[in-house]
């Protein structure tokens, strides 16, 4: 087994040589996941994933004592995973570099904040960057959830494709319009809609957050 850091390109000659010799190549996320006894909530995206990971960690941690927040935000996944148990939750910030080396990584819930052009020096093409970001859903099933930005022109059709193929449950979010299915911001309220029926989740005045992007 070869475990590489996210900074090592998977197309480097050293990595290719190990793969050619039949040696499995994992990243830190895949290694940690192999030892995780609880549930994983994984967050990726070009922008906002660190803030989103922090906020989700605070929310989940308010309800579950054994909640671990990992990634670029603080502690690496591998330093926290041995504390996990069957009731624990790991909220993980996952970069595109880390998604390149997943094999069995299977989050119970994932989120993709947005996808815009980035890291093309590593991924070479926008198509490859998109493919890698979308890998966060690779092992998810209809028992799982993927949350994504309805206003993102790349993510919206990807979500529709996932739902059409019954690959994973998809929940969209939007700050620009009311959704028939999903979570949206409108007139100072955050609401959730299902089949056209809506329910108030929170009023933004009750939240200690600055900026519409944080309500998203």
What are these regions (language model features)?
Residues 124-127, 164-216:
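Adenine nucleotide phosphate-binding catalytic loops in nucleotide-utilizing enzymes
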